């Protein structure tokens, strides 16, 4: 009797599990509104790794010895839906000899694959043509085109023993990434850059990167704009290198005091990441268009831990050259990370303008002056 009851209980449990969501085939990440990214670095301002302060002044980050563009010709394979994609194409041993070349950045519809669609306010896939009715977060499966991208690259010798980051500036609309056959992560969001630390995935000599790109994803429901609906890698792909203790992020505040709109109010916050055996410091210099230093300071990074937030004391700078549309005056900010001996280990920076915007007496003002909008 007990054995028969036990068998009935197990049979019932099996039936329940068979129809439970856990037993059902899981939806892929590109069909989920929660899978917006995996293993990505935190968003931050652009921290271009220049070699010298002179390079910062010139502002041409693409000429930095610590920047490597992956734009250009990639091997490419296009299919009508996910079931037809080459599932193991990311493996270095996979043969791509019969694949075509495609230019990156560039949408695949503009290079002979699929069809570009223009709509203004509706979802392009919510149409009889695709036999699909909008059901967020799901998108069509049978017509969800997939592009498989591959290319090789070599890391400069000067990057040895440094950190290496991969950045994809914009890929429509969902993609997985592999380096040397090793899974890196994924991203969902066509117009947002995504970065991954790939230092431990690199090899000496030639390396291989692979992207599997899906035309539509759950994120496509948030990208319904008055525009052409296109697919693929449409913005820059590149690598950059930093020391293992590096400037991860910084924030500049630069406005005018509102009494006479003459003096500048300057603030700077910097985030340093990466463990260090030794002490270090972070220094900034702010120079005007003639190269004169208007402010400078250096603060020790007391902690040797993984993350340090440094807030420089705010400063009031007398009689700055304000930024406006008529007179777009700019200053140059230099940031230098130093080791315990005072040696500069990383240099970055940006242009800075002093400007204040406000509603004053019912009018929109820039630097205290009303403008027409």
Positions of the model-derived regions?
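Beta-strand-rich binding/interaction modules
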Residues: 177-179, 262-302, 308-310
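N-terminal pre-domain segments of enzymes
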Residues: 25-69, 73-75, 82
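Bacterial Sec-dependent N-terminal signal peptides
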Residues: 1-26
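Extracellular recognition modules
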Residues: 210-212, 332-336
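Accessory beta-strand-rich segments of carbohydrate-active enzymes
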Residues: 29, 60-61, 77-79, 107, ...
């Amino acid at each position: 009797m007990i054995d028969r009851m036990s068998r009935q209980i197990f049979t019932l449990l099996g039936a329940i599990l068979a129809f439970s969501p856990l037993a059902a085939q899981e939806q892929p990440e590109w069909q989920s509104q929660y899978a917006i990214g995996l293993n990505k670095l935190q968003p931050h301002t652009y921290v271009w790794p220049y070699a010298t302060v002179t390079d910062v002044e010139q502002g041409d980050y693409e000429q930095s010895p610590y920047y490597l563009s992956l734009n250009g010709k990639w091997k490419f394979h296009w299919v009508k839906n996910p079931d037809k994609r080459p599932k193991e194409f990311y493996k270095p041993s996979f043969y791509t000899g019969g694949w075509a070349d495609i230019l990156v950045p560039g949408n695949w519809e503009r290079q002979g694959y699929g069809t570009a669609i223009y709509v203004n306010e509706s979802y392009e896939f919510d149409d009889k043509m695709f036999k699909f009715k909008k059901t967020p977060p799901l998108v069509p499966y049978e017509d969800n085109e997939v592009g498989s991208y591959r290319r090789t690259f070599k890391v400069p010798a000067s990057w040895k023993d440094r950190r290496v980051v991969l950045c994809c500036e914009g890929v429509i609309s969902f993609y997985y990434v592999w380096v040397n056959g090793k899974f890196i992560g994924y991203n969902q969001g066509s117009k947002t850059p995504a970065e991954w630390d790939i230092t431990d995935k690199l090899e000496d000599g030639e390396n291989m990167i692979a992207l599997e790109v899906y035309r539509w994803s759950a994120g496509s429901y948030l990208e319904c704009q008055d525009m052409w609906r296109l697919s693929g890698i449409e913005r820059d792909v590149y690598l950059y290198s930093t020391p293992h203790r590096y400037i991860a992020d910084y924030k500049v505040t630069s406005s005018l005091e509102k009494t006479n709109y003459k003096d500048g109010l300057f603030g700077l916050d910097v985030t340093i990441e990466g463990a260090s055996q030794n002490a270090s410091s972070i220094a900034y210099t702010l120079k005007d268009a003639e190269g004169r230093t208007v402010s400078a300071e250096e603060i020790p990074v007391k902690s040797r831990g993984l993350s340090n937030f440094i807030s420089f004391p705010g400063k009031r700078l007398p009689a700055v050259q304000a930024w406006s549309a008529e007179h777009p005056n700019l200053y140059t900010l230099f940031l230098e990370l130093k080791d315990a001996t005072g040696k500069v280990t990383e240099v970055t920076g940006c242009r800075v303008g002093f400007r204040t915007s406000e509603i004053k007496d019912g009018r929109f003002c820039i630097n205290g002056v009303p403008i027409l909008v």
